Every structure is written in C-alpha cells, then in structure tokens.
Amino acid sequence: MKSAKLFLIINIFLISCQDTDGSSTDYLCEGGYSTADILVNINEEIFNSDESVNAFSKFSWTSNKTSRLLSGNGVPNHEVGTFPNENNPNSIKEQNINQSFTLCPTLVSDTGVSVGGPAGAIAYAINSVKFDPATGGRCNDSGECSMAQGQGNWNIEALGHNTFDFGEDMNHAHVQPTGEYHYHGMPELLIDFLGSSDAMTLVGWASDGFPVYARNGYSDTNDLNSSIIKLRSSYKLKSVPDQGRPSILTVLNGGMGQGTTYPNTSIEMGAFTQDFEYVKGSGDLDECNGRIGVTPEFPNGIYYYVVTDDFPYFSRCLKG
C-alpha cells in the first residue's frame, strides 16, 4: 500500500517573482517576450517515500543575464505508479539534469518545428522531470511492431488506446531503460502539488523558453477576469485510416513480458500518431498545442504550450 503522505520537505519551496540578486530584473528582451523574473528562484529537495522511488527529488531554477537554468535529478516529487511493472521493466533512477532556456523566447515559426522523441526532451516540468510525448515504438505495413526502436512508418502512441501498453501510471508517465521517469501527458499529481487542478497552472518550460501550462486557460485570451476553461486541442481522429495502415497486430516485440508475441489482434484507430490530423480552428490551440494569451504569470500575454487530456497530449513541435 502506497503511503498517502509521501514527502518530507527538506528545503522551503522558493518561488519568487523577484530575482534575488537583481541580475535579470533590468534585462530587456529585444523583439521577443521576457520571462526574466518568473520562477527563477526555486530550490527544492524533497524525500519521496513512494515505494517505486524512495529517493530525494532535487531541482533548482535560477537565471543569469540571458538564460533560465535548471539543475535537477529527474526524480518525481509526487506519488507514482509501480515500477517496474508488467509492461515496463524499468526502475526509476536519478538523472543528471542540467538545462538552459532563453529568458527571451521569440516566435520564429508559423507552423512549428518537429522536435522531441525518446532521444530528447521537448520540455521540462518544474520538478526536472522531462515531457516526452512520443515513443520509439513503430509498426510496418504488415503489422509487425516493436515497442522500442521499431522499424516502419507507423509511430505508436503511448496514450489514448488499448492496443499497446507502455506501463504508464496515473501521471501518464513511465520509465525509460536509462531509469528516466518522464511524462507522456497530463502530470496529474504534479498539478496537485503545484496548486489547484481548477486553476491555470504553470507546470514547466519548453526547450524554446516558452512556458507550459496544464489543461486550463482563460476563456478570453486577453482577459484575466474571464472564466477558466479546459482548453481543447485542435487535432481530430481521422474518419478514414491512411492508405497502407496496418489494421492487425501480427508480431509484437518488447510488449508484455518484453519478448516476442503474435497477438493477431486489431490495431484500433488512435494507436498511431498518423491516425490524427490538425483541423485549424476546431479547438482552442494551434498545431503545436499552444496559443497566445494572458496568464497569471504573464498578464500582458505570451505564447504558451498546453498539456491536454486529448491528443497530442503535449506539443510535438516548437514555435520558438
């Protein structure tokens, strides 16, 4: 039984809108947004007694004249699922996270540049756990699939279907072979740790320097006094599968038991990234799951990414 009380707070969680040494307060961004004084004084060390963690979660956010600096060990500061488990054989291990983000993010692409995947992080949460929504799983046209380092044109999604099981927990996260715990979607218990699930909560920073919020935003993008709503992705499930899409899972490598099986089962729509299409204007967000608007931390407005409950769950591209 997992303990309901998981944390021993060692250091006070320091979040400040003022840079303590004044190094970034007077820094002006040219031609872009400024994030210079937002969440740049965080230093936290928490013991997570969850049976799958049993380690300190350590992370700090500071800044210099040009960059936001993250140092952490990638250990979650909240309850997690059981790891290893039947569909994920990996244990959570400390990482060495050192990342920098510009304090002056600028929109440079109208449609976004594809990034991320198992080889890299598209964003980091406040607790130094990375957001990495894609998987290395693929299938070929014959329905021969691998859960990791697969071959073929069809990219397997981690969430939103029952065909493939990557062993995710209640935070839509699991563990890579390196021991790195990472989010594929909504980090539910991190949101609870940071504040109310009904609020607009800043949960991290994207690699291009823009902020990341979870689920909610203002109904009027320009009005801090407007109601908080659940923001909708603009991606839709295709009504007709793409030509050549495999419909039957014939061979599975690295699935349950991590061996080779021959399921001969249907591959439901939504199991592949290619099963979705962007329909401009059908939701609240753009093709990178973001938008421009006011936020509690940026009352004058900024471009921000959103973690959503539906595909793509988190951005697959960056605009900065």
Model-derived features: positions:
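Short loop/beta submotifs within extracellular cysteine-rich repeat domains
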Residues: 109, 190-193, 311-316
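C-terminal motif of bacterial Sec signal peptides marking the signal peptidase cleavage site
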Residues: 13-16
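Short, flexible domain-boundary/linker segments around small modular repeats
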Residues: 126-172, 258-291
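Extracellular structured ligand-interaction cores
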Residues: 96-98, 119-121, 168, 178-182, ...
